[in-house]
Amino acid sequence: MSASPTAGQAGLSYRDAGVDIEAGDALVDRIKPFAKRTMREGVMAGIGGFGALFELSKKYQEPVLVSGTDGVGTKLKLAFQLNRHDTVGQDLVAMSVNDILVQGAEPLFFLDYFACGKLDVETAATVIKGIAHGCELAGCALIGGETAEMPSMYPDGEYDLAGFAVGAVEKKKIIDGSTITPGDVVLGLASSGAHSNGYSLVRKIIDVARPNLDADFHGQRLQDAIMAPTRIYVKPLLSLIETLPVKGMAHITGGGLTENVPRVLADNVTAVIQRDAWTLPPLFQWLQAEGRVADAEMHRVFNCGIGMVVIVAKEDAERAIRHLQAAGEAVWQIGEIRERAEGQAQTVVV
């Protein structure tokens, strides 16, 4: 071991290097009640251990685990600019649980990673409270996470987020799009806004248009519309899956309708989406007008008001719509599946 400091010299500490261990401990104490509210059957230990334990329910006969990981992207830059951190946690959860839901998986647990240059306990607690709220909406447990304070890695007041979700589905009930055939119906579930995608373009439009973000925008502030948290579709869609055969689903994230729907389609079919089947929400009308964004670019970047696509047989479409509406979802029949012509795109918006 090296020599101790000489008389009159103060030894360096981790705090001198920019890491506040006490702040980290205080944060753990703050977030434990939030995590506790998310606990569900299967969780075997509370937050704070080296590893999180989860026992898979015996209700599964041939369980397949489904995992997903994601972040919030540059929507965080707006959170920093507006000093509002209460919704990005739900965004983080939604991006992963909606992804694994597409294959029919029930989200079981979630872990988060919060990284910053200097830990602000109040900000971090607000973010993680939002993560816990998202987990409650999804019915999964916030079973663990990591808070990394890394001096000089991030500017003061900024942080980054990553999330990881694990779910389970019966092997025979995996939804993979393999049963989709021409004549099937494409349903669209309403988004709550831009969700967590396209925000580099959103921020560019704001930079160019320089709007008053506190101005009234259809009954709310413009910033509220822009920062609305990503909708979590888990509970209504798990209920639908138990009610009727769902052939395919697509979470409309980066790439919009035209790049996400093809991910669940076989090569021999195409989805034809009718753009007049739903009304483009005011936020997207504003973004398109202020940014002079072409229709094709809108459909390739934004969800344009459709956060989740569900594909069912034609004879099940009306029943599916009624079921989802009863669960509180706004849903439209937005298109159909057709046989794909040679050279045709797998999803076209007409």
From Swiss-Prot:
Subcellular location per the Swiss-Prot or TrEMBL entry: Cytoplasm
Protein's name according to its UniProt entry: Phosphoribosylformylglycinamidine cyclo-ligase
Family: Belongs to the AIR synthase family.
Catalytic activity: 2-formamido-N(1)-(5-O-phospho-beta-D-ribosyl)acetamidine + ATP = 5-amino-1-(5-phospho-beta-D-ribosyl)imidazole + ADP + phosphate + H(+)
CDD domains cross-referenced by the UniProt entry: PurM
UniProt pathway: Purine metabolism; IMP biosynthesis via de novo pathway; 5-amino-1-(5-phospho-D-ribosyl)imidazole from N(2)-formyl-N(1)-(5-phospho-D-ribosyl)glycinamide: step 2/2
Coiled-coil ranges from the UniProt annotation: none
Protein species of origin: Cupriavidus metallidurans (strain ATCC 43123 / DSM 2839 / NBRC 102507 / CH34) (Ralstonia metallidurans)
GO biological process terms held by the UniProt record: 'de novo' IMP biosynthetic process; adenine biosynthetic process
An MF annotation (GO) of this entry: phosphoribosylformylglycinamidine cyclo-ligase activity
Main location as per UniProt: cytoplasm
